Amino acid sequence: MTRFVLFISCFFLIGMIVECKDGYLVGNDGCKYNCLTRPGHYCANECSRVKGKDGYCYAWMACYCYNMPNWVKTWSRATNKCGKRK
């Protein structure tokens, strides 16, 4: 029984350490991926392309992805460069 509790504790600890990223996908121009005129599965495909688990077209008409690796660039209000000149 003690080993089982120890195993479950380690499992949850690993789950807390290996965090995944959620957010809006960002293109090279710094803008969110637009999905207004795309087919319904477009965002899910784009999210899986960057190793995300799932994605959908959010109310802002942009692709939102779940459980992506930390190296994937996501949109942030603080670092927003969309529509701004370089």
UniProtKB/Swiss-Prot annotation:
Disulphides: C31-C82, C35-C57, C43-C63, C47-C65
Q: Which residues carry this modification: Cysteine amide?
A: C82
Coarse class of the primary localization is: secreted
What does its UniProt record remark on the domains?
Has the structural arrangement of an alpha-helix connected to antiparallel beta-sheets by disulfide bonds (CS-alpha/beta).
The record's SUPFAM superfamilies line, in alphabetical order, gives: Scorpion toxin-like (SSF57095)
GO molecular function annotation: sodium channel inhibitor activity; toxin activity
InterPro entries membership: LCN-type_CS_alpha_beta_dom, Scorpion_toxin-like, Scorpion_toxin-like_sf, Scorpion_toxinL, Scorpion_toxinL/defensin
Q: Which tissues is this chain's protein expressed in?
A: Expressed by the venom gland.
Q: Which residues form the signal peptide?
A: 1-20
* GO terms (BP aspect): defense response
This chain's protein is named: Toxin To11
**Keyword Flavoprotein found:** no
What does the UniProt function comment say about this protein? Beta toxins bind voltage-independently at site-4 of sodium channels (Nav) and shift the voltage of activation toward more negative potentials thereby affecting sodium channel activation and promoting spontaneous and repetitive firing.
